Amino acid sequence: MAGKARVHELAKELGVTSKELLATLKEQGEFVKSASSTVEAPVARRLRESFPSAKSADSAARPAAKPGAPAPSTPATAAKPGGPRPGPKPAAPAPAPVAPAAAAPAATPEAQAPAPAAPAARAVTPAAPATNAPKPGRPTPAAPAPAAPAPAAPAAPAAPAASAPAAPSTGAKPGGPRPGPKPPRVGNNPYSSAPAERPAPRPAPGAPRPGAPRPAPGQGGPRPAPGQGGPRPAPGQGGPRPAPGQGGPRPAPGQGGPRPSPGSMPPRPNPGAMPARSARPAPGGRPGRPGGAPGGRPGGGGGGYRGGGAPGAGAGAPGGGAPAGGFRGRPGGGGRPGQRGAAAGAFGRPGGAPRRGRKSKRQKRQEYDSMQAPAVGGVRLPRGNGETIRLARGASLSDFAEKIDANPAALVQALFNLGEMVTATQSVNDETLELLGGEMNYVVQVVSPEDEDRELLDSFDLTYGEDEGGEEDLESRPPVVTVMGHVDHGKTRLLDTIRKANVREGEAGGITQHIGAYQVLTELDGNERLVTFIDTPGHEAFTAMRARGAKATDLAILVVAADDGVMPQTVEAINHAQAADVPIVVAVNKIDKEGANPDKIRQQLTEYGLVAEEYGGDTMFVDISAKLGTNIDALLEAVLLTADAALDLRANPDMDAQGVAIEAHLDRGRGPVATVLIQRGTLRVGDSIVAGDAYGRVRRMVDEHGDDVLEALPSRPVQVVGFTSVPGAGDNLLVVDEDRIARQIADRRNARKRNALAAKSRKRISLEDLDSALKETSQLNLILKGDNSGTVEALEEALHGIEIDDEVQLRVIDRGVGGVTETNVNLAAASNAIIIGFNVRAEGKATELANREGVDIRYYSVIYQAIDEVEKALKGMLKPIYEEVELGKAEIRAMFRSSKVGNIAGCLVTSGTIRRNAKARLLRDNTVVAETVTISSLKREKEDVVEVREGYECGLTVTYSDIKVGDVIEAYELREKPRD
């Protein structure tokens, strides 16, 4: 093969499959990717040497005669046309074709090899006149036969399309001798009518090559019987072809096409000398023509090359068609223009119209789903069948698209068509995700923070909230009691009395602004018992703190002032305790004050499900006076009795510690400090811990008295030092094996928290609000700094709850625990923000830097003062609202004209006051003629005046020339309207 050969071509040539050839190449160390890859000439030569058996089998398997053809015999004196004869080598001199390697010469006519046959089912019945006798001793070339001979076409007494050459004395005529047979083409031969197993070797360069694109005799297609083909039948000896007139308009033998004799090789007619051919098959080109007229070849092959042949026309005659199965043909003829060829692998499926591939069920299902998919604004979206999609808080459209295998750009465009402007990577709030999911028939389920944290811990093979071990590992622990109630009802005074201390005076404004945790030793039935108390603030801004206190507790003491009754924060505390399924003991405080009515408190609390025992309920009420210390022991006894009766206070102290951060703040000398309540396990110095998005290692633990603690058992509140950052109030504390795990958990929590905060704080902009959103809006940027994280959280929630017009936006760009630093000042200067310090002061040179940069720092110690001032600042940023106030009216009584000032109106002030430079409108017959005019000058007598009151005459000029007698000038001014 010339040049580089492809693997599949070599496989066909060698008679093996491409897979076998690829395996052989791999064994030889040659890297070939696929059957379409090319190989170098040395590699191809080695492959041919590796398959000698295929070549020998090729020659040995060639049949001597196809089924249905008689065996060759010695030539008779009178050969019948169409009779089977062996094809001897013609006696006329002709260029000797080079025989293939598999061909063997025959010494005698009886031992000659069969004539070459095409590898398909072409019918060939060679015949020769009696005068053409084979010459013995002349070798006859034999072409390789196909590996499996195809069955012969229906036998018809017709001469072959190209018979063997005749004797040299016959001369050149249509039935004259033809050049020696050539080997068939390769398997993907477009002129063949049947597939071949493997290609045959090419003829030697000395063999004649046809000049026209028509297939050579013996090559174009299969013949019914092999043989070297005798001479064509003489004129008048054509087979019983049912053509009218035995050949009809066929030319005479001497006038046939310029078919050359063997002596004038290569005498193939050039295309210019050939008769014109039609793209349509001629009448003779229909399949199955049984025979040919005298001097003609068998019926024109169906769909011959560029058209069929005329009835009875020979191969070289005008209109002669190619053998059956040519280009565009089907096996047996009858091809139509545009149809595929019959060669296997050459032009697709053998014969017939182009075949469309069948679609699989999956493709059909995808097409059906695509047709049924919802379209929002022309955008095709996936169709959900009510499936539930779980998304984290603050998820983006890219996260949503990844869950449903969709294009994020399509979701962005769909939301745009729904009136929402969101980018693909922007954190989206829950409502928008649910809206988009509903359009696609998906149920979007936003994962709660608790589920998010549980899934995160599961990924690290950690659990929270369960005791390890069996019942024998559990030990009793002290109860955790939370003191709750309305502000100024005496919660902190009660704890002071219990602790024999004074904490209340240290609170700014006399109100508790953070949670305190203490452990108190008390006696019950002569036994000393430990009780852990948690004090929660009662101000309305500290709702989250009260909720955390209720979740971390075993039992709640509800403090209600006997002289004040049930207040809003009292009801809220009841709801928090009932939501946490926590038993409640009611302490009716301030019974020593005048007007105290404990029975009224019992009646009011009955409405909220707290029925006293004396009324037949199960809630214990204790009347106390925290100021005088009345019935404090009875209250503690009631707490312990309720805890023992309703609760199973046991925990496993031998497991890794788990707890909750009650409070956290940034200490100047110790760094981040967290007040932690241990719920199960034992916390020791040196443990790796993670609480929320903060992590670290326990460096020191301190109790409520300031003493160092080496280990903290369940229900023990301690202050933990060693966090890298300040944890959030209410965050769960967990002990892990390594600092690396703690850092990874904290980083993931921080990322989720940041996404959720971005989705919550970002204001949704719809297309209807786009115009107003593009206008310049006022925005108040704040930086919050506090003494502990719970206070900062409460302050931020309260500030976000301020109801203000959409013209002004409040944005907290940074928050933190500790004093105001220079970094905070630089950020405030860059973003034009105000710094609010709550119970903290500026550190170092932060104050000097703030004065130099012009940054406003506000300090507060009571939370509601900060809220009020921020609300006033927001209202001050609103654009002023003006209202129109009427000043007075003046009627024009006379007109004067002046060359300097124009028209002068002589007026009488009928009501109010007319002022100079005031805005006015001109009325004529109670109709507004000019809406906005200005009183440019005002005179009384001949003196300029500022205003003229009712009942006086005046002269004035206005910035409007078309004034008449009888017009009324109505003066007014615009005054700023205060905001509500």
Curated annotation (Swiss-Prot):
Residues 83-98, 136-154, 201-216, 259-272 have a biased composition (Pro residues). Residues 355-364 have a biased composition (Basic residues). One of its GO terms (molecular function) is translation initiation factor activity. Residues 589-592 are annotated as: G4. InterPro entries: EF-G-like_DII, EFTu-like_2, IF2_II, IF2_N, P-loop_NTPase, Small_GTP-bd, T_Tr_GTP-bd_dom, TF_IF2_bacterial-like. Its main location: cytoplasm. Residues 625-627 are annotated as: G5. GO terms for cellular component: cytosol. Pfam families: EF-G_D2 (PF22042), GTP_EFTU (PF00009), GTP_EFTU_D2 (PF03144), IF-2 (PF11987), IF2_N (PF04760). Residues 535-538 are annotated as: G3. Residues 485-492 are annotated as: G1. Residues 476-647 form the tr-type G domain. Residues 285-338 have a biased composition (Gly residues). The keyword GTP-binding applies. Gene3D superfamilies: 1.10.10.2480, P-loop containing nucleotide triphosphate hydrolases, Translation factors, Translation initiation factor IF- 2, domain 3. Keywords: Cytoplasm, GTP-binding, Initiation factor, Nucleotide-binding, Protein biosynthesis. Residues 510-514 are annotated as: G2. CDD domains: IF2_eIF5B (cd01887), IF2_mtIF2_II (cd03702), mtIF2_IVc (cd03692). It is found in: Cytoplasm. Residues 52-68, 99-135, 155-172, 185-197, 273-283 have a biased composition (Low complexity). GTP binds at residues 485-492, 535-539, 589-592. Residues 28-382 are annotated as: Disordered. One of the essential components for the initiation of protein synthesis. Protects formylmethionyl-tRNA from spontaneous hydrolysis and promotes its binding to the 30S ribosomal subunits. Also involved in the hydrolysis of GTP during the formation of the 70S ribosomal complex. Belongs to the TRAFAC class translation factor GTPase superfamily. Classic translation factor GTPase family. IF-2 subfamily. This is Translation initiation factor IF-2. It comes from Rhodococcus jostii (strain RHA1).
